[in-house]
Amino acid sequence: MVCCGPGRMLLGWAGLLVLAALCLLQVPGAQAAACEPVRIPLCKSLPWNMTKMPNHLHHSTQANAILAMEQFEGLLGTHCSPDLLFFLCAMYAPICTIDFQHEPIKPCKSVCERARQGCEPILIKYRHSWPESLACDELPVYDRGVCISPEAIVTADGADFPMDSSTGHCRGASSERCKCKPVRATQKTYFRNNYNYVIRAKVKEVKMKCHDVTAVVEVKEILKASLVNIPRDTVNLYTTSGCLCPPLTVNEEYVIMGYEDEERSRLLLVEGSIAEKWKDRLGKKVKRWDMKLRHLGLGKTDASDSTQNQKSGRNSNPRPARS
């Protein structure tokens, strides 16, 4: 190929530019970059494994994106928003599919706004502001353009069997039934289990798959919170099995006590959690119990707290945000 060979050194700058353009058109590798595996460590837990460079921040390689994302490690360590990691990875390692190879898919505006709402107060505390490069205004709205959000991604964890709402098990998948051991809300239980969160919430929906059960609740009041940010909004409570324990009924209001998955910024509803029908009297009791627990400095609950940390994979030493 003449144009890509050594060539003659007597060409002017204009000739060189034309020559370079012709070369690029003839070299297959010069076409739009194809999808490539995600190699950014922070983003490997996300529900996509292919990305495309340059990303939305104009980084030409993932190596550059890795260096740029390091500035957010401290902020991610505060768990200020369950949407922050998803949003950052959607910007720094955008999802790439066969249908959308020409241009990376952007995160939805609502995802950015939720992340900013949860984390900007911490940035301000350390005399920083939300980065202009991550501005939400220019991002697409879900129903008006192509964008991604955590709610829009469906994972294929196996067959989707119908659920018998009266018994709480799958039909056709297994004969094994869910047996939930009831846990009563008492001061002794509250001290022993040392729950990460306590909320007053109304159950909006229970999404049931045989291997994936999620309760969607509307948070009315936050009685206790730990590392995972809890918005006064609709949130998901995740299980770690195919059973909803404790059981919940749609449209009922409960006081819910549970744990958190710190690494994935999720609230958990697992065996040992409590869900009792809401009563003002019970809410007042919980507040008194929590005050006593704080006054005792966790006292005798340290050992049980350590055990629960190991069970739920929580880290009791969050990293502060970088100043």
Curated annotation (Swiss-Prot):
Its main location: secreted. SUPFAM superfamilies: Frizzled cysteine-rich domain, TIMP-like. It is found in: Secreted. Pfam families: Fz, NTR. It comes from the Eukaryota. Transmembrane segments: none annotated. Disulfide bonds join 35-96, 43-89, 80-119, 108-147, 112-136. Keywords: Developmental protein, Differentiation, Disulfide bond, Glycoprotein, Secreted, Signal, Wnt signaling pathway. Residues 33-150 form the FZ domain. Expressed in kidney, brain, testis. Weak expression in spleen and heart. GO terms for molecular function: Wnt-protein binding. Residues 1-32 form the signal peptide. The keyword Zinc-finger does not apply. Soluble frizzled-related proteins (sFRPS) function as modulators of Wnt signaling through direct interaction with Wnts. They have a role in regulating cell growth and differentiation in specific cell types. SFRP3/FRZB appears to be involved in limb skeletogenesis. Antagonist of Wnt8 signaling. Regulates chondrocyte maturation and long bone development. This is Secreted frizzled-related protein 3. It comes from Mus musculus. The gene is Frzb.
